[in-house]
Amino acid sequence: MNQIDYYQAKLDFEIDSAELFAALQADQRKLVVVDARPAAAYAKEHIPAAINLPYSNMSNAMVRKLDSDKLYVCYCDGVGSNASTKGAFNLASLGFEVVELRGGLDGWKHDGYTTETTHDASSSA
């Protein structure tokens, strides 16, 4: 694979905070934001409207209720964490269209977007 193909492929499977925010504002029904971190991290802080689907628990049974016609955007803490990559890999392996949020939750906050908390860490898919 040459450099151009590599970077094009990388761009095809990533989204940045501004793109995600715009997509959520335009039509939230077309995508699902997936927090691939453990439930405790999700409960402490997550992107609004995100569902918690820890990468370590993804299975056919767990994702059965997910809509295969939607685009799934996986994220984790950010640089230094690969939970979103593992989550994206798992979802793609199960037949879902998925991209990764570049910069994760740290990048989302750094770009000035809000987060929320939940007391019910079981509010997953």
Model-derived regions: residue spans:
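Glycine-rich nucleotide phosphate-binding loop and flanking beta-alpha elements
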Residues: 40, 59, 80
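Short amphipathic alpha-helix with an adjacent loop that forms part of the alpha/beta core around
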Residues: 23-24, 59-69
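Conserved beta-strand scaffold positions in the cores of enzyme catalytic domains, especially
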Residues: 33, 50-52, 98-100
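Catalytic cysteine-centered active loop of the rhodanese-like fold, especially the PTP/DSP P-loop
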Residues: 64-109
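Short loop/helix-cap segments at secondary-structure boundaries that form the rim of catalytic
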Residues: 42-48, 108
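Short, hinge-like loop/turn segments at secondary-structure boundaries
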Residues: 51, 68-69, 115-119
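Flexible, polar/low-complexity N-terminal or interdomain linker segments that lie immediately upstream
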Residues: 1-32, 36-41, 117-125
